Amino acid sequence: MRRAERRVAGGSGSGSPLLEGRRSTESEVYDDGTNTFFWRAHTLTVLFILTCSLGYVTLLEETPQDTAYNTKRGIVASILVFLCFGVTQAKDGPFSRPHPAYWRFWLCVSVVYELFLIFILFQTVQDGRQFLKYVDPRLGVPLPERDYGGNCLIYDADNKTDPFHNIWDKLDGFVPAHFIGWYLKTLMIRDWWMCMIISVMFEFLEYSLEHQLPNFSECWWDHWIMDVLICNGLGIYCGMKTLEWLSLKTYKWQGLWNIPTYKGKMKRIAFQFTPYSWVRFEWKPASSLHRWLAVCGIILVFLLAELNTFYLKFVLWMPPEHYLVLLRLVFFVNVGGVAMREIYDFMDELKPHRKLGQQAWLVAAITVTELLIVVKYDPHTLTLSLPFYISQCWTLGSILVLTWTVWRFFLRDITMRYKETRRQKQQSHQGRAINNGDGHPGPDDDLLGTGTAEEEGSTNDSVPAEKEGASAAS
């Protein structure tokens, strides 16, 4: 059994729900506690294989006399040794399926990628671009200029053979990429409103920055119909349906060899690629100021990571179809889900000394480093001023958001406290009026009432005393 499961399942009996420390948004988990070879640590096995491999290269393989080849091979070998160490020794994250080692691997890849970005950041612009030739000799060449936007007619009457040719031209490989991307982003964020806000805001960013990057120039129907409504919207819808299924699913796990039927074994293998448990994200941005700022920060980092995809291709001279661009997207898909879960746990944690998760920390560092590379490698493009009407729109939007923030978390609270104080005072005055009206002593009559009661008490006490004296005399 993996370390994450063993930590949660400690003290629970066979087939019992793991309720200890479970949040209200977290599903119940039933686990029989099976500990198989698949889940055990293999630190000695990995160390033995690594030692044998290095020994073979050192003792039995002749070293080539090619300096460039040896340099590349040495760098790759160093990275592989680090990955072997990290996969076996790094700390587990919040996810454990299909295997904790899978997520430890991507954590180590995050470290390698961040170090690579730092190296690129400390090079000159020319050296940094030419260094990529060591990765792929086809890189390091200025990108050819392309025509974006163009004819935006949905129905082109001048084209008799195919009047809808503009639509067919837009149906390329990026259409399924948009759908799959937003489906996976929805699984990361787990909130419909946040996904739609990010989707719409990115289209506004493309409108605003098309004077800097030509590939942001698209037709209006490409922005709002094909991207937001069809590709992004359909991906978000399918993602929300998947989240609904995951939140209702029963999480009951048995060891593979404890399942008697082959059908059950195959089903258990397939479910190995589903979550071990499920936590429903309740971001509640309007509940407090720190949650509101945190959600705004998450949206900004998401948008910044999206923009970095296009700006890095532009400043590092990478064609959009290059495999490095695809590998970066695959990387963010794998690390983004872990980072979002760690951020949510960080926001939900009630301890005074909270600690941001390791993967979330690395994703934030990577996003900022990518931005710094863009700023260093092409400051001229980034400093191209926004058109006046666009800057006015962003200024107005910023003022509206700031005004709502001040009203919601400052003025509204002051107003509510003032109204509550007035309500309490009115209730107090009404209580006094009622007490004075029905004959009961009010708050101002306490002292007077007490004195009268004492006088009456002393008078009543003297009457029996006089009667007792008279009877004794007789």
Curated annotation (Swiss-Prot):
GO terms for molecular function: L-serine-phosphatidylethanolamine phosphatidyltransferase activity. Keywords: Endoplasmic reticulum, Glycoprotein, Lipid biosynthesis, Lipid metabolism, Membrane, Phospholipid biosynthesis, Phospholipid metabolism, Phosphoprotein, Transferase, Transmembrane, Transmembrane helix. The keyword Lipid biosynthesis applies. GO terms for biological process: phosphatidylserine biosynthetic process. GO terms for cellular component: endoplasmic reticulum membrane; membrane. The keyword NAD does not apply. Glycans are attached at residue 159. Its EC number is 2.7.8.29. It catalyses: a 1,2-diacyl-sn-glycero-3-phosphoethanolamine + L-serine = a 1,2-diacyl-sn-glycero-3-phospho-L-serine + ethanolamine; 1-hexadecanoyl-2-(9Z-octadecenoyl)-sn-glycero-3-phosphoethanolamine + L-serine = 1-hexadecanoyl-2-(9Z-octadecenoyl)-sn-glycero-3-phospho-L-serine + ethanolamine; 1-hexadecanoyl-2-(4Z,7Z,10Z,13Z,16Z,19Z-docosahexaenoyl)-sn-glycero-3-phosphoethanolamine + L-serine = 1-hexadecanoyl-2-(4Z,7Z,10Z,13Z,16Z,19Z-docosahexaenoyl)-sn-glycero-3-phosphoserine + ethanolamine; 1-octadecanoyl-2-(5Z,8Z,11Z,14Z)-eicosatetraenoyl-sn-glycero-3-phosphoethanolamine + L-serine = 1-octadecanoyl-2-(5Z,8Z,11Z,14Z)-eicosatetraenoyl-sn-glycero-3-phosphoserine + ethanolamine. It is a multi-pass membrane protein. Residues 464-474 have a biased composition (Basic and acidic residues). Catalyzes a base-exchange reaction in which the polar head group of phosphatidylethanolamine (PE) or phosphatidylcholine (PC) is replaced by L-serine. Catalyzes the conversion of phosphatatidylethanolamine and does not act on phosphatidylcholine. Shows a substrate specificity for phosphatatidylethanolamine and does not act on phosphatidylcholine. Can utilize both phosphatidylethanolamine (PE) plasmalogen and diacyl PE as substrate and the latter is six times better utilized, indicating the importance of an ester linkage at the sn-1 position. This is Phosphatidylserine synthase 2. It comes from Cricetulus griseus. The gene is PTDSS2.
